[in-house]
Amino acid sequence: MARNVQCIKLGCEAEGLDFPPYPGELGKRIFENVSREAWGQWIKHQTMLVNEMRLSMADIKARKYLATQMEAYFFGEGAEQPVGYVPPEK
């Protein structure tokens, strides 16, 4: 049976993650407060950041940058957008 969480990103109760997606306290906070749907949205945003900013996951600075962006995305003012990003029209 799926567990539900009060998702901090979506602002509603939704299906939670099966396990902490990131190590440490940040992973625990995400597991307890972020839904599966919101995590999927972050993965898409993270992929865009990696591709547009040409980040190398072998670079410790890039990994720290993404961790900072992930925390801002869920618990802060929101993650940065790549320079020149224009959101798709709805």
Swiss-Prot record:
Q: Which GO terms describe its molecular function?
A: iron ion binding
Looking at the UniProt record for this protein, which Gene Ontology cellular component terms does it annotate, in alphabetical order?
Answer: cytosol
Check the record and name the InterPro entries matching this protein: Fe_traffick_prot_YggX, Fe_traffick_prot_YggX_sf
What UniProt keywords apply to this chain's record, in alphabetical order? Answer: Iron
Q: Does the keyword Membrane apply?
A: no
Report the domain of life of the source organism. Bacteria
Q: Which SUPFAM superfamilies match?
A: YggX-like
Per the UniProt entry, what is one GO biological process?
cellular response to oxidative stress
Q: Which family does it belong to?
A: Belongs to the Fe(2+)-trafficking protein family.
Chain's role: Could be a mediator in iron transactions between iron acquisition and iron-requiring processes, such as synthesis and/or repair of Fe-S clusters in biosynthetic enzymes.
Specify the protein name: Probable Fe(2+)-trafficking protein
Q: Which organism is it from?
A: Nitrosomonas eutropha (strain DSM 101675 / C91 / Nm57)
